[in-house]
A protein has these predicted regions:
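Acidic, metal-coordinating catalytic segment for phosphate/diphosphate chemistry
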Residues: 10-45
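N-terminal strand-loop-strand
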Residues: 34-69
């Protein structure tokens, strides 16, 4: 099922076409990419917008010390849309998360630097990431999840491309998501 979703995805740009081919190649190796035990594994992210699509909900990530989109590891779950919804609910406490579209918003291979998580070293690895467009009302009560992030807040679309402290993510991912958002159903 996941392979069919990725094969049928129409890339938005050259980066997505190249990354899509690499993800499909990795899937052909027979490695278990659904669990984080491997140096490349699936993750799901959410570009969480307000219903008017003027604001993005982001969390200040505890490990990266930066404002970031919401999401997490597949951990064996092949339905990455469900993973994205669950992660939004867990990471910001939103109870009313609406799937704006079941289609993939974007696809990317994300490099993850080695880091310490819960006192244990996690080696550098790659996230084979699918991003989905989700909606949360700005009236919804959201809050930080202490073990994952230190704060949660809304940003305008332009702020989402400039405020986060990770320049690569701003330039290569968040700006792309905003461009894609303008033409996404």
């Amino acid at each position: 099922m996941l392979r069919d979703v990725i094969e049928s995805y129409v890339p938005f740009c050259e980066q997505e076409e190249v990354d899509r081919r690499e993800i499909l190649r990795l899937m052909d190796t027979g490695m278990d990419l659904m669990h984080r035990d491997f140096p490349a594994h699936f993750s799901a992210s959410a570009w969480v917008v307000s219903p008017d699509r003027e604001h993005i909900l982001m969390a200040h990530h505890r490990i990266y010390h930066a404002w970031s989109w919401l999401g997490g590891h597949a951990d064996g779950e092949e339905d990455l849309l469900s993973v994205a919804v669950r992660e939004v609910q867990e990471e910001c406490g939103a109870s009313r998360v609406r799937v704006a579209s079941p289609k993939i918003l974007s696809l990317e291979i994300l490099p993850v630097q080695g880091h310490v998580k819960r006192g244990v070293w996690v080696s550098s690895h790659q996230h084979l990431n699918l991003t989905y467009l989700l909606e949360v009302s700005r009236d919804e009560q959201v809050h930080a999840r202490e073990e994952e992030n230190t704060a949660v807040r809304w940003f305008t679309l332009s702020e989402a491309e400039t405020v986060p402290e990770e320049a690569w993510m701003c330039e290569q991912v968040y700006a792309k998501l905003n461009r894609r958002l303008r033409s996404f159903p």
